[in-house]
Amino acid sequence: MPLPEPSEQEGESVKAGQEPSPKPGTDVIPAAPRKPREFSKLVLLTASDQDEDGVGSKPQEVHCVLSLEMAGPATLASTLQILPVEEQGGVVQPALEMPEQKCSKLDAAAPQSLEFLRTPFGGRLLVLESFLYKQEKAVGDKVYWKCRQHAELGCRGRAITRGLRATVMRGHCHAPDEQGLEARRQREKLPSLALPEGLGEPQGPEGPGGRVEEPLEGVGPWQCPEEPEPTPGLVLSKPALEEEEAPRALSLLSLPPKKRSILGLGQARPLEFLRTCYGGSFLVHESFLYKREKAVGDKVYWTCRDHALHGCRSRAITQGQRVTVMRGHCHQPDMEGLEARRQQEKAVETLQAGQDGPGSQVDTLLRGVDSLLYRRGPGPLTLTRPRPRKRAKVEDQELPTQPEAPDEHQDMDADPGGPEFLKTPLGGSFLVYESFLYRREKAAGEKVYWTCRDQARMGCRSRAITQGRRVTVMRGHCHPPDLGGLEALRQREKRPNTAQRGSPGGPEFLKTPLGGSFLVYESFLYRREKAAGEKVYWTCRDQARMGCRSRAITQGRRVMVMRRHCHPPDLGGLEALRQREHFPNLAQWDSPDPLRPLEFLRTSLGGRFLVHESFLYRKEKAAGEKVYWMCRDQARLGCRSRAITQGHRIMVMRSHCHQPDLAGLEALRQRERLPTTAQQEDPEKIQVQLCFKTCSPESQQIYGDIKDVRLDGESQ
């Protein structure tokens, strides 16, 4: 109900037992200002000995909501007074017909609760005037917010919240996204997200027990992040316990997600994990498989298993028993594959537990289940088991004391070596399974992991694991088998001499113009790349120029070629290298005739040019006694000619693609001769010339002209 003004209180009489109000004209010294306390509600009691019809009745109580933050200083300084009963009739006595209307006027002045929406990461967004703000920082009781479109649109909108107050600092450079905001609000109203886990089904507007739950004051409509649904066995069965848990869960909603007690939300369903073929773990959530990405503290980050296959961007974060899914999936869950993995997990656990001995019914039914082949191709799911002969050999190794059956002898004769392996040209091994070739990746204990040989070339994701004589294939191939290449490897395996190619005297090598070595094999030239132990690795000489990917490996006198060439051999260049090899004077200059001294010319920057056959070379580098030169027109004309000098010897590597610049060479030679002519002149004459060149015109008139000085100098 409205309070009387201070001016009206001065003229009214006070209640017995209170000090009289000061008279008009008297100075009133207010008390020291105090920090106003925040009261959610003020209760005003009116004492009256009359009932509704004037007969005595109990005092009535009227609840009025006041926000002391919005009140003025006069209201805060004044004291709430209770008027005497005699004067209450027309002033203080509330109208019983409309108590709610008078209270609503005060409610309108009170600040409304701020609206918050949850983010997929468990945070919250502030909603002000249909704009979304994300939290930037918090200093004391102030929370600073910036526009959600700050990074995308460069919006500089800012807001500061303090309690229930919100202050907007800067305007926005864009219109509010009404549709996106409404979509977020609709998402907030989903029944599955209304309450945290462990509270059973949502109960609508009425709480447990039929009571209407009042909304929490000062708490926006943001909920906790998505939680896993509780199992039916964990739902509370007694209604009394549900009535006790519901208010506590509602009170937890007023806390930020990081400060909510996990114990207060009840126990969650344990997470489901499945083992990967590499010994890792898959997270199973809503029939989707997630593979582990990283762990930060107690949080583990997961990505969808089909991220690379379908480009799915779904992510999940686990913290203890809580799961938060960040984005939705762009595909349907693979129910058949998930069920196959679950069966495989159960079978492996049963076999490892060893509850039933070998040869029992369970062992017969689950034999080889750990080698299930899970094919993720476009066709239906196929589950196959290894051949009985492989299992029989494992039993022979594990139980050597048991007698062997005749059929087991036949199986061993049919497959005496287990899985088929072929040697690679580098000395490694290929696994052959169903006409597909697998390259060894790593070994962990008794297990050896293999990848498809065409993984890099065709992006095949098929994997295989061998454990003893057992083979487990993880994924199907995206290509048909290379029967021709497989047959070539088998033929090479049968004829080892073909792998040890080369002449009886060893491989042929030719010296490079720079002093290195070329490997010659089948008229192709290979450049040395690196050496590892006894093996030397070579690459095709035309790799950079023609993109040839052929490789060769030499080990002693053995030569192994990895890939074919994409070009014919350069017979002319090979013959030129062989001719140079036969004439050592071209490379070493060991002729008995005296060597002619090399010609050098100075550059304008103080360097040197090498002159050879009227061509100019610029110095590139020096290594020991050798100096390497490149053609001066390399940048201008793209000439690739090179030269090497060692003492007075010179060796040219490549020919020039242009004619020599005779005019430029002659100009450089003339410039080389000019300083010698100038040095032969009189030094005093040179100094006088330089002095007169730098003198002012007035000085030149006094001392004469430059020509006169030259004449005088010549006459002297």
Curated annotation (Swiss-Prot):
Interacts with CTNNB1 (when unphosphorylated), perhaps preventing interaction of CTNNB1 with TCF4, and thereby regulating transcription activation; phosphorylation of CTNNB1 may inhibit the interaction. A zinc finger (FLYWCH-type) spans 116-174, 273-331, 421-479, 509-567, 600-658. GO terms for biological process: DNA damage response; negative regulation of transcription by RNA polymerase II. Keywords: Centromere, Chromosome, DNA damage, DNA-binding, Isopeptide bond, Metal-binding, Nucleus, Phosphoprotein, Repeat, Transcription, Transcription regulation, Ubl conjugation, Zinc, Zinc-finger. Induction: Up-regulated by ultraviolet (UV) light (at protein level). There is a cross-link at residues 134, 393, 685 (Glycyl lysine isopeptide (Lys-Gly) (interchain with G-Cter in SUMO2)). This is FLYWCH-type zinc finger-containing protein 1. The modification Phosphoserine is found at residues 21, 261, 371, 503, 591, 696. Residues 195-204 have a biased composition (Low complexity). It holds the Pfam family FLYWCH_u. It comes from Homo sapiens. It is found in: Nucleus; Chromosome, Centromere.
